[in-house]
């Protein structure tokens, strides 16, 4: 994980922070092969919108009319939505995409839950053990055993349980800003980790 003292100063063009975050993620990735970035969460709920907002910042290089370019890694990105809107579980959607695209790895981006308030909106976290949300619903759990490919996870803590036994959550004061800046920063770090031959400035220009 990478701790950031002030997320709002570490915008998507802060190359030092982006390079540090990319350096955390890059060793977890396979050395080559296509990568599918999955934006997990509900774009209509601010605290849960980090995944969908981040995939909008990912440099996508795959497509039906895309010509492979030497040195550019094939990358696809999608935000599958929530099961209440699609009628399909996250596992079903991720499994179908993996079977169709056959990526070397699946990178899931999601809002995280923290047990420590000081970590809210201030930590970029990366894992190579899959995505295991706090909810007891196992249809949202994604890992190599279920999907047959390495599953990485990336995210920022955006909420925490208020008190044990109470159905309340705590979020950062400026949650909209945390999601907006966090998605931009995380997207830039993912791009840099996936495309090491392109500079931060080049990637920012390509994504827009």
Question: Predicted segment positions?
Answer:
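A structural signal for small-residue-enriched, beta-sheet-centric alpha/beta enzyme cores
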Residues: 78-79, 92, 108-208
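Gly/Ser/Thr-rich loops at beta-strand to alpha-helix junctions
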Residues: 39-50, 84, 111-115
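Short glycine-rich or small-residue beta-strand-to-loop segments that form or flank ligand, phosphate
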Residues: 3-5, 34-45, 77-81
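Conserved acidic residues
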Residues: 35, 104-105, 151
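A structural-propensity feature for long, helix-poor, extended segments
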Residues: 71-102, 106
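Conserved active-site and cofactor/substrate-binding residues in soluble primary-metabolism enzymes
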Residues: 12, 16, 20, 49, ...
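Glycine-rich phosphate/diphosphate-binding loop of Rossmann-like nucleotide-binding domains
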Residues: 42-73, 77
């Amino acid at each position: 994980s990478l701790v950031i003292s002030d997320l709002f100063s570490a915008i998507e063009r802060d190359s030092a922070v982006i390079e540090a975050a990319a350096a955390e993620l890059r060793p977890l990735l396979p050395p080559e092969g296509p990568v599918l970035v999955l934006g997990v969460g509900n774009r209509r709920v601010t605290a849960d919108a980090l995944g969908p907002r981040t995939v909008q910042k990912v440099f996508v290089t795959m497509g039906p009319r895309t010509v492979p370019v030497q040195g550019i890694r094939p990358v696809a990105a999608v935000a599958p939505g929530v099961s209440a809107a699609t009628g399909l579980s996250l596992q079903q959607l991720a499994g179908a995409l993996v079977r169709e695209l056959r990526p070397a790895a699946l990178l899931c981006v999601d809002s995280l839950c923290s047990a420590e308030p000081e970590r809210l909106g201030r930590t970029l976290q990366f894992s190579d053990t899959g995505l295991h949300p706090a909810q007891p619903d196992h249809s949202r759990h994604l890992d190599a055993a279920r999907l047959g490919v390495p599953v990485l996870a990336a995210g920022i803590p955006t909420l925490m349980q208020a008190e044990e036994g109470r159905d309340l959550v705590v979020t950062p004061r400026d949650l909209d800003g945390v999601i907006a800046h966090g998605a931009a920063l995380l997207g830039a770090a993912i791009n840099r980790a996936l495309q090491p031959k392109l500079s931060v400035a080049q990637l920012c220009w390509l994504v827009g």
